[in-house]
């Protein structure tokens, strides 16, 4: 069975005063999107896990433990972890934790929680974009 991990920031830890976030965004809207993501992954027949983390070292530890527990085919990183400019360093920690903990998994990015399954589908099965390595060029 296809295994997908959706990693994002815990909705209750988001700084909604950050002007780089969409206006009107709140924890309830994010959670509703996460719930849709979980349902959509299940509807596609995937075994989808959700890992919402705090933007600190404890979050990285939780992510590392999750990655160590299962072999994932794809890990989708949510926009809340990568879009706010002030979160760049933490986003780099997330990417490196995924690279170390799931080196064979594809990494995908959603634009909002609701399109998490679409992001993963770009890299799973027949929907996978081909990647040319330098040895194939």
Feature annotation, model-predicted:
Residues 1-21:
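N-terminal, charge-rich interaction modules
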Residues 33, 90-127:
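Ser/Thr/Gly-rich flexible loops in soluble cytosolic domains mediating phosphotransfer, phosphorylation
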Residues 37-57:
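Active-site rim loops that border cofactor/substrate pockets in soluble metabolic enzymes
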Residues 61-99:
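Mid-chain, well-packed structural core segment of small domains
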Residues 57-64, 117-118:
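Structural motif
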Residues 21-39:
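Short catalytic helix/loop segments, enriched in acidic residues and glycine
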Residues 22-25, 48-50, 110-137:
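Short, glycine-/small-residue-rich phosphate/pyrophosphate-handling segment
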């Amino acid at each position: 069975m296809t295994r997908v991990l959706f990693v994002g920031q815990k909705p209750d830890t988001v700084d909604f005063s950050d002007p780089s976030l969409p206006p009107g965004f709140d924890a309830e809207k994010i959670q509703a999107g996460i719930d849709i993501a979980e349902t959509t992954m299940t509807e596609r027949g995937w075994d989808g896990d959700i890992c919402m983390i705090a933007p600190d070292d404890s979050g990285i530890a939780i992510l590392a433990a999750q990655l160590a527990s299962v072999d994932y085919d794809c890990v989708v990183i949510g926009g809340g972890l990568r879009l706010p400019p002030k979160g760049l360093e933490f986003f780099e920690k997330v990417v490196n934790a995924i690279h170390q903990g799931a080196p064979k998994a594809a990494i995908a990015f959603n634009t909002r929680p609701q399109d998490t399954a679409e992001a993963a589908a770009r890299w799973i099965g027949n929907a996978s974009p081909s990647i040319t390595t330098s040895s194939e060029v």
